[in-house]
Amino acid sequence: MHPQQLVVSWFSLVLLASPIMAIWELEKNVYVVELDWYPDAPGETVVLTCDTPEEDGITWTSDHSSEVLGSGKTLTIQVKEFGDAGQYTCHKGGEVLSHSLLLLHKKEDGVWSTDILKKDQKEPKSKTFLKCEAKNYSGHFTCWWLTAVSTDLKFSVKSSRGSSDPRGVTCGAATLSAERVGVEHRDSWKYTVECQEGSSCPAAEESLPIELVVEAVHKLKYENYSSSFFIRDIIRPDPPKNLQLKPLKNSRHVEVSWEYPDTWSTPHSYFSLTFCVQVQGKHKREKKDKLFVDQTSAKVTCPKDASIRVQARDRYYSSSWSEWASVSCS
């Protein structure tokens, strides 16, 4: 649940008549009204106050209708559904004095709505809509999520290392990826964001998880999604680089060698990787047993038209495996 907040500035003031506070400021002049969503729900009584020293001659309109909704410095409305949300504007004569935008956050049967984002069907066991990965222990990580919504969509991302840790985590703006992902038999759009912990010590033991919150607004609907993780749990190295083959004299085997990816943490004697080596036949389904090694080379057979592929992961903590890097036997 999003922390509930009360806007107490004298201008553009938004108040509730109900005893339980269910409205808070998302950004300047934009407010989220939290509603229990069920048939015949009473909704929330909201009082809007015009941001002006003027007292007389004030009228109110909304973006749903040009008709005058009321007059005076305040306007009381009952917010029950999306038709009651939107932008409310106060005027005097032909001049706009101020406006407030109301968004709705639905709760059905005690659960906040999650309509905007979609879960990746490739990971049916995933408990979160947000997926994050880090290529190393530098404190830099990338997160992404999927949505079937293509227009009237806005995201903001917030992150921190625990709620009381002063070390901030800075996230950039969410960007739309060119990649399309199939979810529920239709294409979904993928958004990504890059984040960096301000004061990161790669060799230090993590005691507090990183908290990530993505706020999503689609038209007049507000939702938020969160994830909590340690960097060590989202590590996924880049693939090994510079794969090379060296024929061995009087042997059917070859020596395949590789190097640590440039993006992996150093020194490698401390931040060590382990590797998986596999021979893949001409037809992709023809795969031989996997060989696991800690060094950066291995001896394998390399039939004509086959290829050798290698992937990496953290040696001392069971991180995710990297993508495969491959070299042809031809």
Curated annotation (Swiss-Prot):
Subcellular location: Secreted
Sites carrying sugar chains: 136, 224
Taxonomy of the source species: Eukaryota, Metazoa, Chordata, Craniata, Vertebrata
Keyword set, alphabetical order: Cytokine, Disulfide bond, Glycoprotein, Immunoglobulin domain, Secreted, Signal
PANTHER family named in the record: INTERLEUKIN-12 SUBUNIT BETA (PTHR48485:SF4), INTERLEUKIN-12 SUBUNIT BETA-RELATED (PTHR48485)
Gene name tied to this protein: IL12B
GO cellular component, one term: extracellular space
Disulfide-bonded cysteines: 50-90
Annotated SUPFAM superfamilies: Fibronectin type III, Immunoglobulin
Stretches assigned to the Ig-like C2-type domain: 23-106
Signal peptide: 1-22
Coiled-coil residue windows: none
Task of the protein: Cytokine that can act as a growth factor for activated T and NK cells, enhance the lytic activity of NK/lymphokine-activated killer cells, and stimulate the production of IFN-gamma by resting PBMC.
InterPro entries xref list: FN3_dom, FN3_sf, Hematopoietin_rcpt_L_F3_CS, Ig-like_dom, Ig-like_dom_sf, Ig-like_fold, Ig_sub2, IL-12
Organism from which the protein derives: Lama glama (Llama)
Hydrolase recorded as keyword: no
Family: Belongs to the IL-12B family.
Protein name: Interleukin-12 subunit beta
Self-association and partners: Heterodimer with IL12A; disulfide-linked. The heterodimer is known as interleukin IL-12. Heterodimer with IL23A; disulfide-linked. The heterodimer is known as interleukin IL-23. Also secreted as a monomer. Interacts with NBR1; this interaction promotes IL-12 secretion.
Entry GO MF terms: cytokine activity; cytokine receptor activity
Fibronectin type-III domain location: 239-330
